[in-house]
Amino acid sequence: MAAEADQPALTATGSTSFYTHSTALSTHGASSLCITSLTYPHLHLRLPSAEDAAALLRLFTDYRNIQYDKSCTGLDSADAIDHLIKQWQVVNLPLQRVNIVVVIDGKTVGTGGLGWIGRRKTDGKLIGDAGLMLETDFRNSGYGYESLCMVIDHGFCVLGMDEVHIACVDANAAFKGLMNRKLGFQAERIEDKMFGNEWIWRITKEVWAESPHSAQGRA
């Protein structure tokens, strides 16, 4: 355990073909992360702060946003949101999660990131479970696609993921459309007893790099 606690901070800055980032994640002291789209310069992904509380409470109490996501259960009070933000602000190395908020024109309108990070027991590969939620008014505008691409690409290229997994329920037609048609990845049927997910997309680092959605593919 001591070796894990003494891991050096994960610090990097960079610019790719479609986003820039400043990453400083540390077990000790405050962490920071900001990813800015070059396609939409007013679109940013960053770690949450206390100032996001009202926006997140609004997001998690709007049925249109959470109807297909059981992981949002119980996030319906100011106290629950405050606890969630504090949880998301804590960064442990090795990484266990990197949750972000989506900011457009200075307004917090969504959340996402890698909600769980861990090593697969069979081969030791580092896996990140990715997700994204946007307010209804900001959907079908390209923001969801661009935000998810930034989360995935940053996860592989900066955070060191070997695979990124994304899951949803069968009824979530909009998200299935994003994954199947827009991104073009193949899903597998699953039975997720915890969150009820029925489809999963398992994306390897190599497959992502070769896709037209990655920084490499857009270069």
Task: State the predicted function of each range.
Residues 1-67, 99-219:
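Acyl-donor (CoA/ACP) binding surface of acyl/acetyltransferases
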Residues 79-80, 89-92, 199-200:
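Short, intrinsically disordered/low-complexity patches at protein termini
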Residues 86-101, 110:
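A short helix-loop-beta-strand connector motif used in the catalytic cores of GNAT acetyltransferases and
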Residues 64-87:
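Conserved GNAT-fold acetyl-CoA-binding loop/helix
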